[in-house]
Regions:
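Short, glycine/acidic-enriched loop or turn micro-motifs at the edges of active sites
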Residues: 10, 82, 134, 171
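Active-site-proximal beta-strand elements of phosphoester/diester hydrolases
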Residues: 7, 127-128, 163-167
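N-terminal beta1-alpha1 cap of cysteine-dependent amidohydrolase-like domains
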Residues: 1-73, 80, 106, 175, ...
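Proline-centered loop/turn at the N-terminus of a beta-strand
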Residues: 74-76, 161
């Protein structure tokens, strides 16, 4: 399976690349529209602030293509990349996102931020989080969540071909790799069956 990891200057692309290769993916780190269109799936990583990330994506000219690709092929956002999938964020200044999943990004209410460390999600397995903002979306889009200081944090979201992981699966040990492998297998089923 060929995965285009979007290179827009805001992601830890090499750790993501290493994790994807470990589960058998062919990876291209790119901002080339031709390579993105040729991929079986798209992965949008992200580390940093929402406004700067959207500015960087706009600077590459990729925003219209990414919106189109999300309707045609599996699309995964990780950490800030997941937040960018939504309509908007209040981080810094109100900023429009990609709008691939209905919802918004807001600052978490916890007294101790950023949320850095390991928290349980599915099957009481721990994954690694680093963030101060979280998504607010319809319950139907939330696949799994974590609890941070009494606050529910959507950890995995999904709508159509679009999936997001708020945590870093590439830094979450064998369970993180297993989640990436499950995503890969769902992409391969999509390629094989068309659904």
């Amino acid at each position: 399976m060929n995965v285009a990891v979007i290179d827009y200057g805001m992601g830890n692309v090499f750790n993501v690349e290493r994790a994807l290769k470990a589960i058998g993916c062919h990876v291209v780190i790119t901002n080339d529209p031709i390579e993105i269109e040729a991929a079986d799936a798209i992965l949008l990583p992200g580390v940093g602030a929402f406004p700067q990330a959207m500015a960087s994506l706009h600077a590459t000219g990729l925003v219209p293509l990414l919106k189109q690709m999300a309707t045609e092929k599996p699309f995964l956002g990780i950490c800030l990349g997941m937040q960018l999938l939504f309509n908007s964020s209040t981080e810094g200044v109100l900023t429009e996102g990609l709008g691939l999943i209905e919802g918004r990004v807001e600052r978490m209410r916890a007294k101790r931020l950023p949320h850095v460390g390991w928290n349980s999600i599915l099957r009481d397995e721990d994954v690694y989080f680093v963030h101060s903002y979280h998504v607010v979306t319809d319950e139907a889009h939330i696949v799994a969540s974590a609890d941070y200081m009494g606050e529910r944090v959507p950890a995995i979201v999904h709508d159509g071909l679009v999936t997001g992981m708020q945590f870093h699966p590439e830094k979450s040990g064998t369970f993180g790799l297993r989640l990436l492998k499950e995503w890969k297998e769902s992409v391969e089923r999509e390629i094989t069956t068309g659904n």
